Regions:
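PRPP-associated nucleotide enzymes
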Residues: 1-174
Length: 174
């Protein structure tokens, strides 16, 4: 197993969710047990010595690898959700996507000051959702957060928008 095999397992879907977008569909990679194991093992190896105590996953595809990564790292897992999906008091942030606008919320008691945080999402495009997630995490007085992606679309330069990221790592870059 290698990164070329992982890349080959990711389906390209043209004009989704709107014309002009080439959607990187990771569901085809996730359904293959060997590919899933390789991806999570590679991400684990990168973060295993960072002292991560909380992994924060962005709804919804960030939940898939984020929760597995939290388990492997012996860390807790925190959900960043769309509005109205979390039952307790939340912080909320609105942001722009490459194809519209959206919002994210996090429980106000999700992160402690002493936590070492890893933010995980499936894909970095323009950086809108990741930057919104970092803005939410800054409400917990975290000066810097590790940030992880399965895929980065480098031509969209989303990395430049990620304020407050300590270290940004993408396993695959297109």
């Amino acid at each position: 197993m290698n990164l070329e095999t992982v890349i080959a397992s990711i389906r390209n879907v043209p004009d989704f969710p709107k014309p002009g977008i080439m959607f990187k569909d990771i569901t085809t990679a996730m359904k293959d047990a060997e590919v899933l194991k390789f991806i999570t093992d590679e991400l684990y190896e990168y973060y295993k010595d960072k002292g991560i105590t909380k992994v924060v996953g962005v709804e919804s595809r960030g939940f898939v690898l984020g929760s597995i990564l939290a388990y492997k790292l012996g860390a807790g897992f925190v959900l960043l959700r769309k509005p109205g999906k979390l039952p307790a008091e939340t912080f909320k942030v609105d942001y722009e996507l490459e194809y519209g606008t959206d919002s994210l919320e996090i429980h106000k008691d999700a992160i402690d000051e002493k936590d070492v945080v890893l933010l995980h999402d499936d894909l970095l495009a323009t950086g809108g959702s990741a930057n919104a997630a970092l803005e939410l995490l800054s409400k917990f007085s975290h000066n810097s957060v590790y940030v992880s992606f399965l895929i980065e679309l480098t031509f969209l330069n989303g990395r430049s928008r990620l304020n407050g990221a300590k270290d940004i790592h993408a396993l695959i870059k297109f």
